[in-house]
Structure formats: structure tokens, C-alpha cells
Amino acid sequence: MRLEALAVALPEVTGHPNRVPFEGVLTLVDEPSNRPPSGARGHRVILTREAALAALPSLMGMAVDYAPGWDGHDARRKCGIITRADVEANRLRVSGYLFGKDFPEVEDRMRSGKAGMMGMSYEIADAHVEDMNAEIWKLTRATFTGAAILLREKAAYRNTSFQLAAKHCREFASRRAPADRPRRLNERNIFQPEKGKEARWK
């Protein structure tokens, strides 16, 4: 088993309300997708291991986003950040933080949904296809620009996953506030629309 990993070190802040740890499988390498990703012109795709490893640095610090129906991408709904990525066997795994205070609906969805229901989908730019005439496109180079959280059944790869980190789930259960605890006013989020076009593939 080969393992390649990269991580961005962030200082620990115990009980930070806007850092909700997550983990997931973003995609599989050296395996064809189960369905064509959007932007692939009806072709299934293979992300080569070499391309995935070369692109790992571009994944650090990228955002995770979601669409209200949990069925696609919306780059303007950036609800978290990726701080670690590794390729183990054929899985590209990621972890990071959801912005739980800013996007409580995302955290609520993760807690209330069935286990194994959610998946992930990468977003890329500057993708190079080995043979555009091939039935299955082989990606030999790409730059990661983000990732989406969506229903696993909607993802191009059925074996992706997304869940809150187990440690956080245990801590959350042990420190739940009483129902009569005063609530703080939420701060308003301000989004800056992305410029340029990217290939956001499921």
C-alpha cells in the first residue's frame, strides 16, 4: 500500500464554533467513473494516480461547497476548507473543516442524514485529456479548484464519501448546551463571486 499526503497546519482552538472537522473520499484514482461528470461531454473519466499526486498541492486550502438540493456544485456556497489530502491505494481522501457557525444547515444535514448517504465531487481546471477521441477520458494533468458535498448517488463516483469526523461527533454530544442557553447573533456572510470558468465535475 502506497501513501502520499499533504496537509496545512492550523493552530488548534478548542471548541471553535466555526470549525467542524470533516473527512471524506473525494474520488478514486486509476479507476473509471461510474457515470460521466458534468463538463466531460458525456465521457466517463479516469484520474490517473500520477495526475492526482501532482495536483495534491493545489487541493490545499481549497473550499468545499454545496447546492441546496445536494445534487451538484455551487462555487458561491463555500461552506468549508480542505486542510489535508492523501492518496492511499486507489482513494483520494481529504479532511478539513466546515464553517459550522456560518452554515448551520450543512452541519445539521450531516448529523441528521443516514450514514453513507453523502459523497463528494472534485472541481478542476486546466485538465489535460490523453485522447479526446477515447470512450473514457484519461486525465493526465489537472488543477484542483475545490470540491462539492452532494448525495453519493449523484456523484460520478459511487464510492466517494463525506462525514463529520468521529472525534468531533463525540465532543459535540458531550458538550451540547442546555435548551435555555442564550443564542448569539449570527454574523452575516459576504461572498465574493468566483471569476473565470472552471470544470466542476461530479
Predicted regions and their residues:
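Short, surface-exposed beta-strand/loop "edge" segments at domain boundaries and coil↔beta transitions
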Residues: L26-P37, A54, W70-D74, K101-E107, ...
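Intrinsically disordered, low-complexity terminal tails
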Residues: M1-F22, N133-E135, Q163-K202
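A broadly used, surface-exposed interaction patch
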Residues: A54-L92, G96
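Residue microenvironments linked to proteolytic maturation
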Residues: T83-S174
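Extended Gly/Ser/Thr-rich low-complexity repeat segments
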Residues: P36-R49, A55-A63, E105-A125
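Short amphipathic beta-strand and strand-loop transition segments with alternating hydrophobic
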Residues: L6-V13, R76-V87, H128
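Polar/acidic, low-complexity leader/linker segments enriched in S/T/G and N/D
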Residues: M1-L59, R175
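Intrinsic-disorder/low-complexity regions
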Residues: P17, V64, H73, A85, ...
